[in-house]
Amino acid sequence: MQIVILKDSAEVAAYGANIFIKQLQKKTNSVLGLATGSTPVSLYRGLIEACDAELISFKDVTSFNLDEYLGLKGTHPQSYRYFMNEQLFNHIDIIKAQTYVPPGDAENPLEACVGYEEKIKAAGGIDIQLLGIGRNGHIGFNEPSSGLMSRTRVKTLTKATIEDNARFFHDDEYQPHLSITMGIGTILDAKKVVLLATGENKADAILATVEGPLMAACPASALQLHTDAVLVIDEAAASKLSDRDFYKHIENENQKLMAKLP
């Protein structure tokens, strides 16, 4: 894994956005894996600005989101389809029919999971997958104990995840306890993975992901198996890593090398 430690959340978002901008400039018909939550919002703003400046275009892009609450229609304000429309899709030149989010209102969720995998395969696979990380190390809605080679499926959310996401729902509003999520195996199939994490509350999860053993108790630790995974984190999220200075040294040397390449 490539570990990039930056000062704060603004630098993390800018660095992450630049990775996606370079990908779209290199391959205009890229297949993007996208994520929701508070961490990617600033990254999406960077992509919107780049699109407005005509540095990139999304006209030929296909996107697949990681997950969706089971039981919410795409028009529900807390659905991830609604989130993506509001935070990104409504502000760029992407064709909405080429944006896919797991159907939270599917009549047969099990069939919908199989169909989602088939759509990803038909698109040629995901070129670059964006991830956040939960306090318990979950990626997507792959909670601890998830199989490390799992595929898109229905998952029950843990108490910790439900509590973390409760702030998005009103006290009298239904909050789903089930989801449809890409599996860890689905995520690992992406050609490149970019995980963003900020804040001290993510420090334990980052420690387990980077320096802990490969284990189902920390789903994000599966990224140790990926040949092109980049973790972009701020100082607070990196605060419990024992080799912070070494990771910074490696990244500095990598940047020097990249600057010399044609």
From Swiss-Prot:
Highest taxon in the source lineage: Bacteria
PROSITE patterns in the cross-refs: GLC_GALNAC_ISOMERASE (PS01161)
Family recorded in the similarity comment: Belongs to the glucosamine/galactosamine-6-phosphate isomerase family. NagB subfamily.
Enzyme type, top EC level: hydrolase
Gene Ontology CC: cytoplasm
Task performed by this protein: Catalyzes the reversible isomerization-deamination of glucosamine 6-phosphate (GlcN6P) to form fructose 6-phosphate (Fru6P) and ammonium ion.
Pathway: Amino-sugar metabolism; N-acetylneuraminate degradation; D-fructose 6-phosphate from N-acetylneuraminate: step 5/5
Keyword field: Carbohydrate metabolism, Hydrolase
Molecular function GO terms recorded: glucosamine-6-phosphate deaminase activity; identical protein binding
HAMAP family, alphabetized: GlcN6P_deamin (MF_01241)
Keyword field contains Hydrolase: yes
One GO term of the biological process aspect: N-acetylneuraminate catabolic process
Keyword Lipid metabolism: no
Gene3D superfamilies registered for this protein in UniProt: 3.40.50.1360
Catalyzed reaction equations: alpha-D-glucosamine 6-phosphate + H2O = beta-D-fructose 6-phosphate + NH4(+)
Residue pairs linked by disulfide bridges in the UniProt entry: none
UniProt-listed PANTHER family: GLUCOSAMINE-6-PHOSPHATE ISOMERASE
Record: active site: 67, 136, 138, 143
Subunit annotation: Homohexamer.
EC number: 3.5.99.6
Protein name in UniProt: Glucosamine-6-phosphate deaminase
